[in-house]
Amino acid sequence: MTKKIDFYFDFISPYSFLAHKKIINSNDRSKFNYKAILLGGLHNLGGITAPAFNERKMKNMKNDCTLIAEKNKIDFIWNDKFPINSLYLMRGYLFINNNKKDKYFDLCFDAYWKNNEDISNEETIKNILTKCEINHNDFETGIKAVSYTHLTLPTST
C-alpha cells in the first residue's frame, strides 16, 4: 500500500493553488490527502506577519507566484480582493460529501486565483454550490455544525 502525502491548503493561499495545479497537471491527485488549514491562524500561531500585510513581502510574493505560474504554464491572476477571510469556504470543504469535494475545491480555487472572483461574495458562493449540485440552505446549516477542530495545523512527527 502506497502512503499518501498530506497536502495542507487554504483557498486564500496562492502557493496552495499553484501546488494543487501542479498535482492536477501531473495526474497525481489520488496520491495526496488534502487537509484544510486556516493560513491566518497558522501565521498567528507562529507569530508571523502574513505577507498580505507587509508591502515588501507582498510584492515579492506576487512576483514569485507569477513566475511559478508562468514556468508551469498555469493560468493565474493575482486576486484583487486578496486577502479574504476563508473560514466560511474552508468549513464548507469539511462539510461537503467526499464525492463533491474535488469539484468544490477546484471551483473555489479557480474562481479566486484563475478568474479573479470574490469567493467571499454570497452570489459567487451560490454559483459554486449550484455547479457542485449542493443545496445552499443545507450548506449553510452544515457549516455551522462543522467543528473548528477539523481545520488542522500541521504537526511535527
Q: Across the structure, where does each feature detected by a protein language model lie?
A:
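Structural alpha/beta surface segment adjacent to cysteine/selenocysteine redox centers
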Residues: 17-115
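Anionic group-transfer/hydrolysis microenvironments
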Residues: 12, 38, 154
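Strongly charged, low-complexity linkers/loops
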Residues: 126-148
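Short, hydrophobic secondary-structure boundary micro-motifs
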Residues: 77-79, 105, 120-121, 137-141
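Histidine/lysine/aspartate-rich catalytic loop segments that bind and position anionic ligands
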Residues: 113-114, 118-123
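Local sequence-structure signature of Cys/Sec-based thiol-disulfide redox active-site neighborhoods
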Residues: 3-19
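Conserved small/polar residues in nucleotide/adenosyl-binding loops
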Residues: 149-155
